[in-house]
Amino acid sequence: MPCLAPFGFVCAGWHDAAVRYSVDVPNFGEFAAPEVFAEVARRAEGAGWDALLVWDHVVGEKDLRWEIADPWILLTAAALVTSRIRLGTAITPVARRRPSKLAREVTTLDRLTGGRMILGAGLGAPVGGEYGSFGDTTDTKVLAERLDEGLHVLDLLWSGEPVTYRGNQITVDDVVFRPVPVQRPRVPVWVGGVWPNKAPMRRAARWDGAIPVTAGWDSGGPPDLTEVAELVTFLRGCRAENGLADRPFDIVIGGTSPPGPAAGRDLAGPLADLGITWWDERMPWGDDLGRAEPILRRIEQGPPRI
């Protein structure tokens, strides 16, 4: 399988492009069937999309009683029917996962795909459903600390070197995790959060990309260019403060693109001018969110390339 990596990551076969295009689907509803998710992946690759991202819920909105699948099994099904597109989560609530298990899962998939994995990471939502339903804390300060420590431990484990770590939330005692991911120095980590909340975007600026939720994403409207410009400026400032201004970094903006190539280009072009590196195609919140047919129809139309 060809090996893909983000800018600055080591993995043969990656090609440069101004903007790349992903499809973003939930892990519930019709997508909870692995064969359906695999078909979505196969068609997305055939239609020229660059990545397929899946949500990572265990409960979600409790009153909706969704059928929900494990995202890692879904991604495995997708890996077996694709050879080019990147695969990842958007997003995995790292604070509710054991770093040892998550590190193994992501590494195994990165090796299975020949280096095509992306880990989208964040707190996740709704906190009450995703954490409180199983007796876990819903204190967001504690969860944020667990998230930060979890990401740090993942990075250490993926090095393949002996790891000993003592944090407030996580402890690791003399562990070596091998094999390591194909992508070096690690599988790229994109951090999510709701903009204009600045804390999650400060966190994102310390890693490899930001995949924020911006205003109007759930209604099918295009992103507000002023809002995106403010976000890009903020992220670049944080990168500079961290001494990372010259390092590769992805900015992923999502929404529902308008139909037709010309309209799609009119959407993607101004966003590219602002500095985004990925457009993430998302279905608006509603009755069609968990249905495969609408997203397959959109996939077949191809990405809104500039």
Segments the model singles out, each with a brief description of its role:
Residues P2-I306:
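Active-site-adjacent structural elements that line small-molecule/cofactor binding pockets in enzymes
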